[in-house]
Amino acid sequence: MCESKTAAAVVKKQKDTGTWGGNLLGLAPSPAQGIKDVGTIPNYRRLLQLEWPRTGRPFKLADRVLFRLLSRDEDPALLFELQKLVKSDPEASIWAREIIREAASAALAEAGYAEDPRLRGAGHKIASSISQFLRSPVADKPFVKSGKAIALHPEAHPPSWYSVAMIAAMPNLRRERAGFTERLGHYLAQPAPKKPFVIQVGKRSIKPQHLLLGDPIEADAKGYPKDTPLALHYIELLAQMGALEWAPVATRVLARLLKDCDETGVWSPKNLRSQPKALNKITYHYYPLHLDANTTEGREVDITFRLALIAKLLGWQLDYA
């Protein structure tokens, strides 16, 4: 994959500082947030998915930045795109640094740093915050009214796409905290709330894109997912954690997708006229890896690859044609 135009295009956009787009978390350009391009952490994770060599210069440069984000360094510059928010509202500082550390931890865990003491320390701290939430009554009633809106309880610290990705990529942490991992798996298997909600960040109300209050997969009665890339990403995380069996919607969607595989294991649904589209930007790093969708075979590649990877994570025997 490292020679692909897709990976080369990602590398080309990296600055000498090790960052991308002048920001950390941006999943797409956002003039309102001052984000001109996709940020450092999504692009770093995308390079990992594209199998760019870990010893390469892009990772060496970015690793320095990510490990610094895990530290207790209070340098305002490390807030990147959230710096303006915190400057105008200092109460938002704790939230900003927490989300940045979670995202950086996910990226470093996926990069193979699971046993690095710096990441282990951050990982256990993140896991402890989630564990405290899961054990509290707030986990069952996580919302409060805030004027006309529904807001997340101020004491709620639910898992996020970042923290779950980190935990999924840290097998020893999961073994050391087996009880927590099981509680988290059951929590992630329940349906996510349907109603939109906001979180209070300092004096502002923000619509969160990163939090997971249950299984986010939406599927019809036949098991077809509304957002196939998001469904596969979530199923893959649950499979890594050994929690897929507890998630009824996720298992139903996986079964439906597998039904569309032919005798050689290739995902080939009828009348596939276009590549499944990602509706949620959270899967930017994950999908698509194969951009050529001009042929039927090209449209099948990504989903086939993900289904094979999930099968491998589940311990299934794969026969390659």
Question: What residue ranges belong to the model's regions?
Answer:
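Preference for long, amphipathic alpha-helical scaffolds in soluble/luminal domains
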Residues: 1-321
